[in-house]
Amino acid sequence: MFDYNQLNKLKDKIQSSDGLQIKDRTYLYKTYRSVFVGYECVDWIFGNCPDIKTREDAIKLGQTLFDAGIICNVTSGADPIFKDDYIFYQFDNNKNNNNINNNNNNATSTATTATAPITPVSTKIGSIGKSSSKSSTAVDKMNNNNNNNNNNNNNNNNNNNNNSNNSNSNNNSSRRTSSVPPPVLVTASLSSSTSSSSSSTTSTSSSLASTNTNSNSTYNSNSFNKKHHRYSINELSKVVLEDLNTVTLVKDELIQLSQELMNGDKGLKLQKKKKGAAGTTISCFSGSQLIDWLVKKLEVTRKESIQIASALMHLNIFIEVGTIFNSSNNNNNNNNGGGGVMSSTLSTTIPSSISLQQLSNQSQSNSNSSSSSSILNLSFTAPISISSTTATMSSSLSLSTTAATTTTTTTSSSLLNNSSSGSGFLVPTLPASVLNSSSNSNNQLYSSSPLSLSTSSIPAFDNRIVEDCGNVFYEFLTKPEAIINHVAMRRLDDLCLTHKCISIIPTTIINTSKFLRIIDLSFNQLSESNQLESIATLYNLESCNLSHNQLSTLPSSFSRLELLTKLILSHNCFQVIPNVVFQLSNLEELSLAANQLSSISESIGSLKSLEKLDLSFNKQINKIPKELGLLVRLKSLNVLGSNKINELPSFLSTLPLLEQLDFSRDIIKSPPKEITSKGFTHIIGYLKDLFEGTETLSHIKLMVLGSEKTGRSSLVKALTKSQTKSLSRQSANFLKKVTSSEVSLNDPIEIIQLKLDLPPEQQNGIMTSSSNLNLSTGTLPPPTQLSSSTSELKPQRKDSFGSSMTTPEKKRPTKRNVKLMIYDFRMPSIDVYYHTHQFFLSERAFYLVTYDINKDLSHSGLEFWVESIKKKAPNAPIYIVATHIDTFNQYGGDILVPLNEIDQYLTQRSLEVTGVIGVSSTTLRNIDLLKNEIIQTLLNQSNNNNNNNNNNNYNNNKQSNSISTTNWLNERIPSIYITLETNLQEEAKKRPIVTWDEYQNIAKLSNFTTSSYEKLVRATNTLNRWGSIIWFEDSKSSLKDFVILDPQWFSDCFYKLLLAKHSFINSDGILLLSNLKNIWKPNIVPEQFHIKLLKLLERYQILYTLKNNSNLQQLQQQQQQQKSFGNLSKENSLNSMSYSIESRSSSSPLPTVVTLSAEISSSPSLSLSNSSQSVFTNPNNNNNNKSEQQQQQQQQQQQPQPISTSPKLLRNSLKNLKSIENNSSSLSNNSILNSNSNSSGNLLQNGSYISFNRIIIPCLLPNGKPSHLASLWDTWSGEDEHQIGRYYQFRNISAKNCFERVMVRFLYMMEPIVYWSTGILFRKTQTYRENIKDSMSSCGTLVEFDTVTQQLQIRVRGHEFDACAKLFQIVLENVDTILKDYQINQSQTYIPCSCSCECRDLPHLFPIDLIEETFGKGESHTKCPITMKLVSLCKISPDITLSSVSSNKKVSKEDLIYQEEIGVGGFSRVYKGIYKNNTVAIKQFNFERMDLIDSTSFNNLNSLTISPSNSSLSISLSSSTSSLSPPIVNNNNNNNNLNNNLNNLNNNNKLYIQQQQQTQQNQQQQQQQQQQQQQQQQQQQQQQQQQQQQQQQQQQQNQQQPKILQRNLSTSSLSSNSSQGEDSMNQISSGKLNAINEFRREVWLMSGLSHSNIVLMKGFCFEPYAIVMEYMDIGSLSSFLKKKKEDGQVLDWQMLLKIVTDIASGMAFLHNITPPLVHRDLKSPNILLASHPTNPNEISAKVSDFGLSRSIVQNFSSKVVDNPTWQSPEVLKGMEYNEKSDIYSFGMILWECYHLELPFDEFDFKFMSTLEDNILSGLRPSINQNCNRMYSSLITKCWNADPNLRPSFNSILKTLNEIKDSTINSK
């Protein structure tokens, strides 16, 4: 049915993030990772494969996937058959699944059954539930019912007291004295209800089923008595999961366990025994035999096994046949068995035709000699109630729609007598706990009141337990007839016949009609309605489960089931909802999931009592009828997987009790994803907004984007030819006053109105014939083009209820048109256009991206524009418009060739667009065709899921699913939103920016009240997505405190910054914060908004802020003093741009860079002037009066000069500069102090704190490499120079932003030599203590971003290898922090070879995984395939081999002597040991458990050798949600666009052009050299790696498109003979590698730390991975304080001060090193204590565990610890944080040391999330009133919510010393 290519596509789709949901699940106390359930897979296939029409076809396709090895069983042992059942499967990612044609029938088998009905997922799931706590539970209802019936049963209970007492006394000597509590089955409702949860055999505990799903237990956890195993009847109902001694399993687990139990080969071995007088032989097993099997199978204790076995017995899996007695013991047996209950053997000894009446008559004839007995039937959601029947069995059943009566079985005394007279019957007795309970004359125990019915079909069960002994035997019940008879005999109210292969229901089921309330017939073979007639006789039935059958209709007799409240019909063949269902007026839960329904009947409104409706995975349902709004009691609605329901009707907001919605988020278009992603409350709120009134938008935006000179404006003119043009001056507030002739040139955005005629709308739909379109007839015949579908589609208009609107009948069709507002961007600067166009993008816009068909695709910028649009509007239609086809002369003028090239270009980069079309704006060729495509795309939006088979269309399955929008022509928008937008547009003419308070006042004019805050937030977010305003709902910053009403005003603000390039911004792209007020004049931008606008520009990644340091003032000094030192020779001088001279002490921190994240307190309400009266004024430019020659000279002075290529001369020049540095710093010392009196920050007038004083604008940096870069870099190109490098391969072009953050960090952390827009060359600043020859300052580092290969390339060169290795480690540390904090994913990491000078320039790239593998094997070298030389791993990867750490720190395992274990961590164990005759602590890492973190294996790359020159490297690029960087812009074009405003740049551009030409020549030469080396390389590969290349070719044939996985592996000459399956690296998980990297980081960090209060690392070991540290004999501070508390002792005040002072001293050292180190996990368990060797009473404290520590160069944003006890509020919020977070943690330690308790333990929070919420709300531990005042004040300061108000550790040490002195003085 599916060919090879289709299976490959299906495999990719089902395994994608939007495919089948996989998660960790528990089955029989074992957790399985990344698994799914069989029926989930069938549901997904049925819902997502259009060709699959039935579930049978879906099962067959699942079997095909199973046979192909794409999916496999979790465990081994079962038949390799794919089942639509509760079976666990997983994706077989550990095998090579490329060859799908080879059936893998030997895949690992035996499925493990799902433990619960897990939520099946089609694509992205929207499971929305409203959290609410219910005060009234089933337990409360049952207790009330019991109390009401106590008096009615008082007499009956008193009559039975004597019998009960006798039973109790006789049972005192009984063998049944087990203290094990009765089994408890606990279930909970799933938060995400689906077809499976409704249609499964039971609704089970999701907490047991999945570790990822929260559940709400039915029981109260506080009522469980954990000290005793015997309970009263009421206590039994309150047993909960939290008790470790009580084993609870869900029903599905028990059912599957029973199947394994009855498996002849691996199940229980049965014994042959004789029973009865006739000596009938039966197959049975003993209790101890069963317990032994369970203990071995489940690896649990015997007590737990008894619990599980008892639960199986209560499910009627087996029955007790009792003890076989001899004749001589009859009397004793009779005495011991008095009052016992007849065993369930009756169900096998009586004929199947026996009737309940016959049994009743027999019971009545022996009523005088029989003793009534009670069987406890425990419902899983209600307390136990025992109903005692009289001897005549005359008790009436109390029935209700919501309760079930639990009855007891009264056995015949004649049968009991027979069993006592040697008949051989096996008579069981009741447990003592039951008889003891029954001896109490408690009316409540013997009431006959009904019980609350369970919400699932788990049967009621009593407190019988399986006996763990060898003389009590049990027999399996396998036949349905026997189970029915057993239930009838024991009068149970629950009948479970699941998985019994039933095709006809036995007629004996009528015997259960009087008391049966729950029946489960799921997973059988019922297909005809007449087979269900017998169910209609069960007039007391309340729950019926018929799921997983083949039913298509129900018998009309079902209407008799008047008490039915729950009906499960999921996973059947229903095409319509049976009419009989609508007659069940008491129905509360209805599930029709995974059927073939095509519509929802309007009769659904008749089910007034319905509370839960599941219609999921009926993919033909296209709307929700408005009659559903009549279900006022509805609480849960599930339409998940209904692929044609694309909107949620507004009437759902009127359902008062609705608390849960389940739907497919990628299909639902209204509400939009921005609303649905926020949860249930926001969805209902938006639907309420719609319900109050809706409108359709009057127009649709059509935005024309594209690079410069691609014909954007010409295309707009061609589209609007012969139509009236409507101009819009967007920046009237800012632009200069110009004449009318200048308007068209300077208007930044020209908005033109275009009206297109739509096909006439008729009563039955929309006519889409192309003949009705307003197309020009004079155009040339269109060539074959790539476009969207033009198939005939008929969308319907919807009203607010989601139903089709009735069009008035007319004789002629209605004529319609659509109004498009074309946005033509005419920004005055290319930089402004590239960076600020994103302000105007709208999710409700149509996009045209222009591209000149005559230009090279690689420079088209299509990636940038498509990614930029996708970021703001991921589902908007995008057309690539190839212009200038009239001038295309290649390929004989056939434009099909370049259009196909565009198609391939987009496909290779995974750029998803709607279509590609070629046009000519001059001849108007295909312009009408483009209009037609726009119209058809708008019409087809409501039917965007239809497949298009037109070969000329650029459209595949992936694109058609992802590029899908709502039907904008008919979409209803809340009227209040449109009113607000109109009012804001009027207000924007007066003031373009307002505070949030002012914005709320404006909203009041649009009928937004004070109480409608959430509505205003929804409306504001919607307008922001439309591009009407700019606002960020960001609780982590102050961006939410203001709203920009005019996006063009904000764009002009940025333009003003660019205009100041030569007046206030130097050539380095640096702007002083103090100069900002000279650019943004007060009458243009109020100064109160300056910082906020900078924050917003940084959020868009247009500019970056730089943290305060003295670099800036020194840079200014250097520029001013350059003339004084002008007599220096070129060899001994460095210009201002090359080197930033710094004068710092060795102890001061390095200057740092921080993203604009520091919180600035909100300014008071601002009074803005009327912006319409303010215009831009050009700032004073000092260069305006200079001649062109002077400007050129100044520009040349600013450019870095070439220096000598000799490293020796460079080092000499650096020595000479040292004296200059000292002189320059002394000359202007006073000026520095005056200009930077507050070195740590600036204070605003209102007291707000600013942590930066400079801004860098990357777009102002030169685009091309400096011409003298080669000469600078060649400084370190000698034979004796070393090189260490690392290449990061990224997936998409957004990685450019990653480089910008890296560059900004190194700009002021290091000493830049030269930098440009895509690279930076720097050295580390030299300190006076360093020897320049051996220091890191003698090394050079080049960091570049290759825009062609999307690689971030890092190379460090130097004469001394140790210095290079140390510097390289620092660079990697900072890059790694940026990648993690900003969650930037790179697809692969490479290590460049440096075996020779030639290889250093054009290196072979080793995949890092290969080096990891080689080093893991103990090898020290690898071979370079280019030069065939051996390369030392230590030289190319010092971070992996830790060669940067001193060699005397490396320890061999033989040198270590292990002693006892002293600590255990998550993935490490700490041992006490001996090293060099000294006692040490050995922290040994255990990576065997890393498979629990990440089971992702590594696969091979297709390419062996990857060189940076290989621009044709195939990389699969994916779209990204991060901000994008614009493509490289030619500065010459910039000059043309700036026009008269930037005339002073002309001469500068000439110099740039010259540099670019020279750079291009150098690049051409390099390319030629690269091509020659590539040819040599290819020849070597063909000779030496021929076999491996053949394997790669075979892999390429099996794959359609190359892909980049997370950590790929490439073979080399060392492993060329190894097959892919034998590659040992494939067995290493990425989680393990990450852990190993953290081990290396910790070793590297600790090796450089030396302080008396830092735990000293004495060495490290690779085999095994271990760190040897000094031994701290007392242990952790946490355990020390705990022991003090337990012993009732207090911590001596002097000792307390000594401990906290030691900790503060160690942390002060970390924060003051260069660069500072943030611990990030400071807590009492990570503080180790040791006693003094000579004075045991003296204790020293030391800081340890640096696995999470990071160098603080800029703030962090990632949360690395899950326990919130010691975490600061900014970390919990996910905000950026710095060393101040350690201060907060230290405050908690201060409190902990004084109170000897863990923080927040006093509040007894049960959930970490609750604790986090309270911490964020300001909760802190209570401080004892007797605490020292200064100490208490210090605690409060340290844990202040504002990080800026927390003291530093230097200040803390000073305070602690003052406390110590005050204590001494007080004595």
Curated annotation (Swiss-Prot):
In its UniProt record, a GO molecular function of this protein is: protein serine/threonine kinase activity
Q: Which residues bind ATP?
A: I1462, G1463, V1464, G1465, G1466, F1467, S1468, R1469, V1470, K1483
Q: Does the keyword Repeat apply?
A: yes
Top-level class of the enzyme under EC nomenclature: transferase
Q: Bias category Low complexity: which stretches?
A: 121-223, 768-793
What Enzyme Commission number(s) appear in the record? 2.7.11.1
Q: What InterPro entries does this protein map onto?
A: COR-A, DEP_dom, Kinase-like_dom_sf, Leu-rich_rpt, Leu-rich_rpt_typical-subtyp, LRR_dom_sf, LRR_R13L4/SHOC2-like, P-loop_NTPase
An example of a Gene Ontology BP annotation on this entry? intracellular signal transduction
Recorded GO cellular component terms are: cytoplasm; cytosol
Domain DEP, residue spans: 16-93, 264-342
CDD domains the record matches: DEP, STKc_MAP3K-like
Keyword GTP-binding attributed = no
- List the Pfam families hit by this protein, alphabetically: COR-A (PF16095), DEP (PF00610), LRR_14 (PF23598), PK_Tyr_Ser-Thr (PF07714), Roc (PF08477)
Region span, Disordered: 96-115, 121-225, 763-813, 942-961, 1163-1207, 1509-1546
**Active site residues according to the UniProt entry:** D1721 (proton acceptor)
Tell me what reaction this enzyme catalyses.
L-seryl-[protein] + ATP = O-phospho-L-seryl-[protein] + ADP + H(+); L-threonyl-[protein] + ATP = O-phospho-L-threonyl-[protein] + ADP + H(+)
Q: Where is the Protein kinase domain?
A: 1456-1864
Q: Which Gene3D superfamilies match?
A: P-loop containing nucleotide triphosphate hydrolases, Phosphorylase Kinase, domain 1, Ribonuclease Inhibitor, Transferase(Phosphotransferase) domain 1, Winged helix-like DNA-binding domain superfamily/Winged helix DNA-binding domain
> Where are LRR repeat segments found?
491-512, 515-536, 540-561, 563-584, 586-607, 609-631, 633-656, 657-678
Q: Which UniProt keywords apply?
A: ATP-binding, Kinase, Leucine-rich repeat, Nucleotide-binding, Repeat, Serine/threonine-protein kinase, Transferase
What the record says about family reads: Belongs to the protein kinase superfamily. TKL Ser/Thr protein kinase family. ROCO subfamily.
PANTHER family in the record, alphabetically? SERINE-THREONINE PROTEIN KINASE, SERINE_THREONINE-PROTEIN KINASE ROCO8-RELATED
Name of the protein in its database record:
Probable serine/threonine-protein kinase roco8
